[in-house]
Amino acid sequence: MATGSYFPPPGAPSSISPRNSTPALSPLSPPLQQRSNALSNRLTSVLSVSYADSDIRDALETLSLRGVHNTAEVRRQLRLDVQKEVVDCNAEIVRDFGNVAEQLKRIGSVISSLKETCDEMRKHIVLAKQDTTPVLEEASALMIQKQEAETKQRLLDAFTKHFIVSEEELLALTSIEEPIDDEFFDVLARVKQVHRDCEALLGAEHERLGLELMEKSSRSLNSAYQKLYRWIQKEFKSLNLEDPQISGTIRQALRVLAERPSLFQTCLDFFAEARDYVLSDAFHYALTDAVSGGDSAVKPIEFSAHDPLRYIGDMLAWVHSTTVSEREALETLFVAEGDELAKGIQAGLNSEPWSRIDEDEEMTFDGQKALSDLVSRDLIGVARSLRQRVELVIQGHDDPVTCYKVINLLSFYQTIFSKLVGPNSNLAELLKALEKFTLNHFQTIMRDEVNNISTDHSALAPPDDLSAPQFLHDSLEVLTALMKTHEASLGTEDPSITSESEENEFTPVLHAALDPFFTLAKASADELPDPTARAIYLTNVHITTRSTISPYPFATSTHLPPLSATLSTLRVELLESQHRYLLDTSGLQVLLTALQPFSQSNESGTEKDLAAIADLPAFQAEALISTSQQLDDFLPSALMDATDNLKRVQSATFVKSVTEEAVEAFCRDFEFVEGMIIGADEARGVGQSDGAVNEEGEEGDGDGDGEVELELEVEQRGQGQSLRKLFPRTTGEIRVLLS
C-alpha cells in the first residue's frame, strides 16, 4: 500500500488564503454597516484568541515548517490547499485500510483452516487419551510399587549390613581353628554392637525379630568369649613375663575378656597358680641351685644360712626384687593401655548385677588394688617358703641383738611391701607376723637369761665396790647395741614425737631387755645390811642405767622419769647420811640434841629460857671445850673425809652436789648453835661484858690486866663463864674451812 504525507511539503504553494486576507466584495454582501459590525466582531474574535494555546502554537509551528510565504494568493488558497491535503491523506488512509481488510480476510481464512485442523487433532487426542489412560494408570502403579520395593530393599540391605553377621565372620569369631587376631576383635565388636542395638528392636514393633537376633548374638558372644578364654589360658602357659615385648594381642584379649568378670576371674586364678608355681621354683633355685646356672659369682642364698641377718636379708631382697619385677610385668600386661581394662571390668560388673553380694551396694573396680592382690597371689608359695625358713633360722639362734636386727629388717621390708602391694596384702601380713614371731623369740631369750641369772646367787651378790652388778652391765651393753640398731633403722621416731607420747616402738624392747635385769639389780641390794651402802649401790645401778639410755630419746621417754625420781629419793638418803656424818664427826650433834627444846620453832622464848642453856650438861665448860676441840680437829679434813665417805658412788658430780648440800645443811645447824650460844650469853648478861672486854682488850696495851679483873668481877657477881669464849668458832669460819 502506497504511503504518502498527509500535508504538502514546506514551500509548496497553498490555495488557502490567510484568515486576515481581505475578502472580495460581492454584490450579494450585506450592507456596509453590517460589514463594519462583522469586521468588528471578527477583529474582536481574533484579538480574543490566546496564541499561548498549545494547539495554536503547534499550528503555527506546522505552518512555519511548510515555508509558506505571506502573499494574497497563498492566503486565499491556504484553506483549500489544506483541505485538499486532508482529503488526499484520508484517501490514502482508506486505501491502506482496504489493503488491511484484504489481509485480514486472508488471515481469517487461515485461522478457520487452523481451527478445523485443531478440532481434528483434538478428536485424535481424545481418542488417544482414551486408549492410553489405562496404560498410564498401570504404569503409575508400577512406579509406586517400584519405589516401595527399592525402599524396602534399601532397608533390608541396611538391616542386613547392621544386624546380620555373615557366616565367614561367625566362623572367624567362634571357630577354634581360626586364630585370635584383629579380625576376631573386629567381628566381636560388631556382634556386641548388634546385641546392644537389638534393644531398639525390642522397644519397637519388631519384638520377635529383636528377640531372635539378640538370642543369636548372645550365643555368638558366649562362644567367642569361651574361645578367647581358652586361648588366653593357653597363652598363659607359655607366657614369659620377663620378656619386655609382651604380645599386644594378649593384652587386648585380656581387656575384652574383662567384660566377662567370671571368665576373667577364672583366667586370673589360673594365671596366679601358674605364676605361683614359676616363682616358687625360681625362689627354690635362688636358695639352693644358683651355682648350677653357670654364674659362679652368684652363690645360693643357703650359703649364708649361718648368718641369720644376711640370710633373711638376702631372701627378703630376692622377694622384693621379684615383687617389683612381677608388678611391673603385670602393669605392662594389664594396665599398659590406660584404664581400658578397668572400664571393661566395670562394664562387666554392671552387666552382671546378680554377681553382687549386696544388691544395694554399687561395685566399683579398683585397678591398683586388683593388681596388688594379683601380685600377692602370685607370691603365695614364695611367702609360705619364706615364712618356714625365717622361723626356722630364728628359732636356731639365741643372740638377742641379731634377733632385734632381724626385727628391724622385717619392719623395714614390711613398710616397703605395704607401699608396694598394700598394707593388707599377704606379704605385708606375713612380714608383720614374722616380726611378731621374732619379737616373741627375742623376749623368750631375755626371759631365759633373766631366769638363769635369778638362780645364780653369786651373780646377784653386789660387788665389793658397790658398783652396778656385772649382769646389769652385760644387759646394758646388749641394750646399747639394740638402741643403736633402732636409731639407725627406718622406724626410728622423731624425738619431738617420742617426748609427747610415752609409748613407742622401742618400749616393748625396753620391757624385755632392761626392766627384768634392772629389777634383779635393785632386788640384790637387799643383801646389803648398811643403809648407806645400799643407797650407794642403788645409786650406782640407777646412774649406770640412766647414762646408758640418756642419748636415746625413744628410751628416755618411757624410762628416764622413773629413774630420775628414784635417783632423787636416793640422793636425799645420801644427803641425810652425809649430814649425819658431819654432825657426828664434828661433835655438833651433841649440842643440837641438847638444844632440841630450844629449836627454831621456840625462838620466841624468854631470856630466862635462853639463860638456862648454860645449865645444860653439854654446855658446861669442860664438855663445851671438848666439843670445840673435836670441831677444830674435824674441820681441816672435813670436806675430804665427807667426799671420801661417798667415793664408791660412780659419779663425781653426784658426790660433789650431795656433799655440798650436806655441808650447807651442817653450816645452817652450826649457825643455829652459834645463835643459841650468843643468845644464852646475852640472856645472862655475859655477852655484853665479853663485848666490853673485847673492845677494851682491843684498845688496851695487850697486857690482859683488865680482862682478868673483869673475869673476877663477873665471878663475884655469880654470872658464870661466857659460852662464846668456850666455843669461839663462827659460821663464817666454818663456811670458809668447808668450802
From Swiss-Prot:
CC terms in the record's Gene Ontology section: Golgi membrane; Golgi transport complex
GO process terms (BP): intra-Golgi vesicle-mediated transport; protein transport
InterPro entries the record matches: COG6 (IPR010490), COG6_C (IPR048369), COG6_N (IPR048368)
Subcellular location: Golgi apparatus membrane
One Pfam family in the UniProt entry: COG6_N
Membrane-protein topology: Peripheral membrane protein
Acidic residues bias locations: 693-706
Region ranges (Disordered): 1-35, 686-706
Keyword line: Golgi apparatus, Membrane, Protein transport, Transport
Record-linked PANTHER family: COMPONENT OF OLIGOMERIC GOLGI COMPLEX 6, CONSERVED OLIGOMERIC GOLGI COMPLEX SUBUNIT 6
Role played: Acts as a component of the peripheral membrane COG complex that is involved in intra-Golgi protein trafficking. COG is located at the cis-Golgi, and regulates tethering of retrograde intra-Golgi vesicles and possibly a number of other membrane trafficking events.
Family (UniProt): Belongs to the COG6 family.
UniProt name for this protein: Conserved oligomeric Golgi complex subunit 6
The organism's taxonomic lineage, starting at the top: Eukaryota, Fungi, Dikarya, Ascomycota, Pezizomycotina
